[in-house]
């Protein structure tokens, strides 16, 4: 936190967990009471909604626009807040869109949050090292709301340590203490072997991470070039993560003679069954009309996958 985000936390403000997903679940279960509202900008990572439901919270979705890279504006956030709102969960860089919030955008969001009492934020920053623009910006950098921000991170994305399962939070001490109690009823401490591996990752050079990021950038540029060559797909330039989230609604109502594409689920199943390319429907992320493609694959695989997608979509009428 100090090296990469210039955030100062005492030891009692840090909690390590079995992956960032558990870190988020701990916070949601500690903060959200039944019936309280949790704001989720659409599209959102699938686990956010499920965890809110487990806590008995009420999900309030905030629609966003492809033209704005699916980023929530401060005005959109402000209009969604009610007296029942307890928590906002958002990610930057974002899964599934790859959207990255700028410092100014985060400041505007922070000012809205500061204007409401007892509103907390989970800032999921798991993809912080896979950002293609300027340096990553953390919401908790703004001191006037730091005591209401829970910053979540982990080792799986920036250090390619998915199987080691280690995530962590920086949070107000009272929330961190509650998360320790909550986690103690599920998994207790994080695997000691994974913690040793994490020390090596966090204290070592970031050069391997930078090389990985540069490789993802090349793949992003490649997949955008290939997607832009397919009629009917509308996309944008994602600034982080390793996903793109195109709009494919122009294909709805079309058929290959056997299957009719009525929604994003149909679209993705048709690609799987006919082109043998696996993607994820936007409905899984709360955003009908789009689908997610991961470019965490070799350039050869990306080229072949996009060739198959283009060929199949060419059969639709």
PLM features: residue spans?
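PLP-dependent class I/II
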Residues: 2-317
């Amino acid at each position: 936190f100090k090296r990469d985000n210039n955030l100062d936390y005492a030891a009692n403000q840090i909690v390590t967990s079995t992956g960032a997903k558990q870190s988020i679940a701990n916070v949601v279960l500690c903060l959200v009471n039944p019936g309280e509202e949790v704001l989720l900008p659409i599209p959102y990572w699938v686990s956010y909604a499920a965890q809110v439901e487990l806590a008995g919270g009420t999900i309030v979705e905030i629609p966003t626009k492809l033209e704005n890279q699916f980023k929530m504006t401060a005005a959109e956030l402000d209009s969604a807040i009610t007296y029942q709102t307890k928590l906002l969960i958002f990610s930057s860089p974002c899964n599934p869109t790859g959207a990255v919030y700028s410092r100014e955008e985060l400041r505007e969001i922070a000012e809205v949050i500061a204007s409401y009492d007892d509103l907390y934020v989970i800032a999921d920053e798991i993809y912080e090292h896979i950002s293609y623009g300027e340096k990553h910006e953390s919401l908790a950098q703004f001191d006037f709301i730091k005591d209401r921000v829970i910053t979540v991170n982990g080792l799986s994305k920036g250090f390619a340590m998915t199987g080691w399962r280690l995530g962590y939070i920086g949070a107000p001490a009272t929330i961190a203490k509650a998360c320790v109690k909550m986690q103690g009823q599920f998994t207790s401490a994080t695997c000691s072997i994974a913690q040793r591996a994490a020390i090596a990752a966090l204290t070592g050079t970031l050069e391997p991470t930078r090389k990985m990021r540069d490789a993802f950038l090349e793949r992003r540029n490649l997949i955008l070039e290939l997607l832009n060559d397919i009629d009917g797909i509308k996309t944008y330039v994602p600034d982080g993560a390793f996903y793109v989230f195109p709009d494919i609604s122009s294909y709805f109502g079309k058929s290959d003679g056997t299957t009719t594409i009525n929604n994003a689920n149909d679209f993705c199943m048709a690609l799987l069954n006919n082109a043998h390319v696996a993607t994820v429907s936007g409905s899984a992320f709360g955003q009908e009309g789009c689908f997610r493609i991961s470019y965490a694959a070799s350039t050869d695989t990306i080229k072949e996958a996009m060739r198959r997608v283009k060929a199949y979509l060419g059969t639709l009428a």
